[in-house]
Amino acid sequence: MEEKKSKVILHGTWISTYSKRVEIALKLKGVLYEYLEEDLQNKSESLIQLNPVHKKIPVLVHDGKPVAESLVILEYIDETWTNSPRFFPEDPYERAQVRFWVSYINQQVFEVMGQVMSQEGEAQAKSVEEARKRFKVLDEGLKKHFPNKNIRRNDDVGLLEITIIATLGGYKAHREAIGVDIIGPVNTPTLYNWIERLQDLSVIKEVEVPHDTLVTFIQKYRQKCLQQAANA
């Protein structure tokens, strides 16, 4: 851990994949921090003041200075605490590829995951088909651009790995809650292998949501979405 006397506070929510990204990043760097759970149905005045533009989590407060948006926060953490692991490769092309696939997950993958979770019947079947296509693209991209990736310890984790495990690490809970199988050793072997190796790391175990808790949340969230759609 790098010696740095400072006050670090993270405003987040336990279920947010964006909050999890920041938690993982802080733990990887060995940064001591205070965690404040926010109720997004009743946002605190401090959250609104710290992030007046979006009024969203996560917000990192470092020595009284707020930083918002998960990707911006992760870059800030990496530039402020320069000890290992570094979240971006030194090679410019590899760094560009990391940014590209993080963007792909944030836009293409996250979107279709939400559709699969909140739909049923024919609409869901179409979204599942689209999800499998997008996940296949991600899987092939990881295989092509990061062929020598070996995840064995915390120092092997960077921005892309953080994004993958925070966003997709709960795929087994999604499968149990929704009954849809997308990630697996046959469908997405490279992605599956990355996730399995990441889940073996101690830093990931520290922040992961218990399986049964996540299943229950997804089921309740799905029912809420379906009820809202029925009443629309």
Swiss-Prot record:
InterPro entries: Glutathione-S-Trfase_C-like, Glutathione-S-Trfase_C_sf, Glutathione_S-Trfase, Glutathione_S-Trfase_N, GST_C_Tau, Omega/Tau-like, Thioredoxin-like_sf. Residues 6-85 form the GST N-terminal domain. GO terms for molecular function: glutathione transferase activity. Residues 91-226 form the GST C-terminal domain. One of its GO terms (biological process) is toxin catabolic process. Glutathione binds at S16, T17, N42, K43, K56, I57, E69, S70. GO terms for cellular component: cytoplasm; cytosol. It catalyses: RX + glutathione = an S-substituted glutathione + a halide anion + H(+). It is found in: Cytoplasm, Cytosol. Its EC number is 2.5.1.18. Its main location: cytoplasm. Pfam families: GST_N (PF02798). Keywords: Cytoplasm, Detoxification, Transferase. PANTHER family: GLUTATHIONE S-TRANSFERASE U10 (PTHR11260:SF775), GLUTATHIONE S-TRANSFERASE, GST, SUPERFAMILY, GST DOMAIN CONTAINING (PTHR11260). Belongs to the GST superfamily. Tau family. May be involved in the conjugation of reduced glutathione to a wide number of exogenous and endogenous hydrophobic electrophiles and have a detoxification role against certain herbicides. This is Glutathione S-transferase U10. The lineage of its organism: Eukaryota, Viridiplantae, Streptophyta, Embryophyta, Tracheophyta. The gene is GSTU10.
